[in-house]
């Protein structure tokens, strides 16, 4: 197997954005859920750790925003994205505004690695014969 490994340093804000984009892509979040995930991650980063970790996040909507801060979306849009995060196991309701976080998707570390493996699809013998006739498949014999 061949591997290409690159390391990039990012500031705190950019790191959270890159992390959110990688997780969103891996889990196939729609655009609204991606934006809400980013907002929830930002809120999680502000959550104080207790006993070395933070296992939940307060998501209280008031004053036209999340925790009173404008996040560039309406409450209805936020709730739609939150619904997808709940359905996909990113968070779980603890109370009306407090949510357990999935520790595999929320952390306060300083590094992350996303690995996507590509595998060559095997061809059937009929497909292989047709491709070989076209000179498009090298058969190992």
Language-model features: locations:
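N-terminal start-of-chain detector that recognizes signal peptides
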Residues: 6-11, 63-64, 70-74, 127-129
């Amino acid at each position: 197997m061949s591997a290409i490994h690159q390391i990039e340093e990012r500031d705190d804000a950019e790191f959270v954005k890159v992390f959110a984009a990688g997780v969103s892509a891996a889990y196939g979040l729609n655009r609204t859920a991606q934006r809400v995930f980013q907002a929830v991650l930002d809120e999680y980063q502000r959550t104080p750790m207790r006993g070395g970790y933070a296992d939940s996040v307060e998501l209280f909507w008031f004053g036209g925003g999340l925790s009173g801060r404008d996040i560039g979306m309406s409450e209805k849009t936020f709730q739609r994205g939150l619904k997808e995060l709940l359905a996909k196991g990113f968070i779980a309701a603890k109370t009306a505004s407090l949510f357990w976080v999935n520790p595999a998707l929320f952390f306060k570390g300083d590094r992350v690695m996303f690995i996507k493996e590509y595998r060559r699809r095997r061809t059937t013998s009929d497909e292989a014969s047709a491709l070989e006739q076209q000179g498009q498949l090298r058969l190992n014999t």
